[in-house]
C-alpha cells in the first residue's frame, strides 16, 4: 500500500459518503466549509471530505468526524442564491486524518493518503471480484434501483480496489455500512466487506419480495371470498335460508332504537348494523360486528342509581361495618353533605394508602353501600399494557374493550363506585405506560369524554366515584398522584384489633361456619388479646381472621367428635388449638446499660423497636457497622460519628479518642435488612454513651434524622413507631420537634401513657437519654 502525507482543507459532510472514483455534487452552506473550498481552489484544487458521525451536529468537533475519508479533486463550483455553494468533486483516493492543524477560519488537517496497489493477478482476489459481479447482478435485478449498465461497466474494471469502491457507490445501504467499506484500506479486506454487505442486502430484498407475494395472495383471496359470499347470498335468497339472518338484523335494530344510547353511540351502532347486513351475519367479519354491537348495547350509557344522601344513615353504615378509619369516614360524610347542597358536585377521587389487611378494599364496599351506588372492583396489580385500560383496537384479532369499560358493563349504571385496587402495582413495558392511561380516567375535567380504543365512542365517566388503593406512594407516578386525594390508612392498634375481632371477625366467622343455635362458641377477651400478641405480627387483621377461623374449625371438629354443646376459648385453650406462640412481644431491657439504646422503626407491617448497640475497643479511629444496614443508614452513622468527633469535648470525651479507639455499632437481627435515616439520633446516643461511659435510660426510645451540625430532622410513621414502643414497655419517647403535629395521630389512650420529649438539637436527645445528662464532669 503506497502512502503519502498531505496537508489539506477538510469539509465534514452530513449524510453523504464519497468513495474514490466517484463523481458527485453537493451543496455547502457552513462558513468554515466555504472557506475550505476557497483555500483548496487557491492551491491544487484538492480537498479532504469526511462524514460526520451524527448529521444533526451543526458545528462538529474532532471527535464528531470519521477519521477515514476521501481526497477529492474539485471539478466545478457554482454559486447559489444566498450564501450557499454547489460543488462538483471526483474522488481520488482514501485518506486518514493524522492530526488536526487548525479549526479557524476553516478546518485543516494532516492527511495520510493511501493508494491502491496493482495486485489484481492474485487468484483469490479474482475469485472475489467474479463472485461480487454475480451477486451484484442479482442485487440490480431485485432492487430495481440500479441500471443494468452498471453490471456491464464493472466487467471492464481490473483494479480490485477501484472495483470495490465503485460497487459500494451503487449500493443503497446504511451510512455505517458504507463507512465500514471506506475504512477498509486493504483491497482484499474491502472486497470481502462488500461481498458481505451485498449478501445481507440480497436476503432482505428476497424477504421483501416474498412478503409482497403473500400480501398479493391475501388480497386475491379476500376478493375471491367476496365473490363467493355474493353467490351464497343469491342462493340463500332463492332457498329462503336468510330468514334467520333477517330476524337477527331486525332484533338488533329494535334494541338500538329502544336502548338508552347516546346520539353518537346510536349512530355508530346503526352504521355497524348496515355493515353487518352487507357482510352477512355468518361471515368472519359479521362475527366481529355482532360482538361490537353487543358491547354497545350492554353498556349503561344513561342508566343511573339515585344517591342516598342521608348523612345519619351513611355514618351508621360506615361505623357498623368498620371500626376506626375515621379519616376515610369523615371524608365520605363531607362529600355527602356538600353533594346534598350542590347537586352538580363531581365525585371525589380518593386514594387509600396503607399496609395490607387494614380494610382499604372493604371500606370501599361500605362507601358504595352508604351512598347507594353499585360497586365494581378492578384489580390493577401487574398491569403493564396501556391497552388493558384503554382497550385494543378492533383491527386486532380477539380485540376487547379495556378494564374501565368492562367495569362499567359489570356495574350496570354510569355512576357506580369503582375501586381501582393496587394502583401502585402497575408497571410499564414496551407496550406503553399503563399509569399514563389512567390520567384521562381520573381527570374530572376530561373523563366525561373517555374514549376506549375498542368502542371508539365517548363514554361519560364524570359521575363515577373513583376509589383507589395502594400500599405505598413511592411507585405511583407524580402526575397520577396529583389527581387523587391521599388518605393514609395506618395500621391498627392492639385495642382496635381487639374491637375489630370481637365485633366483626368472630361474628363473621361463626356465621360462615353455620353454627347451630344449640351449639355455642365464646371467645374470652383474654384469648383475643393473646392471639393478637402471640400469633400475629401485622398492621391489618387478615392473619388474625385466619387464626380465629382455624380455632373455630378445630372447635367444630371437637363438638362433632365429642358431642359438646358449648366451648369457651381462653388464652390457655388458644395454645391448645394454635400450638406454641409464633411471636414474642418486643420488650426493652429492664436495666440501664452503656452503649445500648432503643430506637424505633417503621415497617410494612406497622412499627417496631430497633435496638442499637455500640462498643469501644482499642484501634485507630475506625467505625465498624454491622446488622445488614442499607446505604442511607450507613451514611447516617458516618454523619453521627463525625458529629461526635467534632463535639467530643462538650460530652466529656477525650478529643483524641479516635487515635487509639475503634467504635463498633451493631443493629441486632442481622438477617433482616434495615435502612432509612431515622436512626441517626439512636446511633449518636449509643456512640456518646459508649465513649463517655454513661448509661442510657432503658425506658427511653427515640427516633430522628440528624445533620452534621447536630440538628434533629423530622421522620415519618410516628404513630406506628409509638405503638411499637408502647408495646415494648417504653414510657418516654424522644422525637423531632418538627413532628409535634403528628402526636395527635397517636390514639388518645396511648398518648396519655407516653411522655413525648421534643428535640431540635442532639443535645436535647442526649440530655434526656443519658443518665446524668451531658455535663462533662466525667
From Swiss-Prot:
One of its GO terms (molecular function) is serine-type endopeptidase activity. Transmembrane segments: none annotated. Coiled coil: none annotated. Its EC number is 3.4.21.53. Its main location: cytoplasm. Keywords: ATP-binding, Cytoplasm, Hydrolase, Nucleotide-binding, Protease, Serine protease, Stress response. ATP binds at residues 354-361. Residues 591-772 form the Lon proteolytic domain. Induction: By heat shock. It is found in: Cytoplasm. It comes from the Bacteria. The active site is at residues 678, 721. The keyword Ubl conjugation does not apply. It is an enzyme of class 3 (hydrolase). GO terms for cellular component: cytoplasm. It catalyses: Hydrolysis of proteins in presence of ATP. Residues 8-202 form the Lon N-terminal domain. Homohexamer. Organized in a ring with a central cavity. ATP-dependent serine protease that mediates the selective degradation of mutant and abnormal proteins as well as certain short-lived regulatory proteins. Required for cellular homeostasis and for survival from DNA damage and developmental changes induced by stress. Degrades polypeptides processively to yield small peptide fragments that are 5 to 10 amino acids long. Binds to DNA in a double-stranded, site-specific manner. Belongs to the peptidase S16 family. This is Lon protease. It comes from Clostridium acetobutylicum (strain ATCC 824 / DSM 792 / JCM 1419 / IAM 19013 / LMG 5710 / NBRC 13948 / NRRL B-527 / VKM B-1787 / 2291 / W).
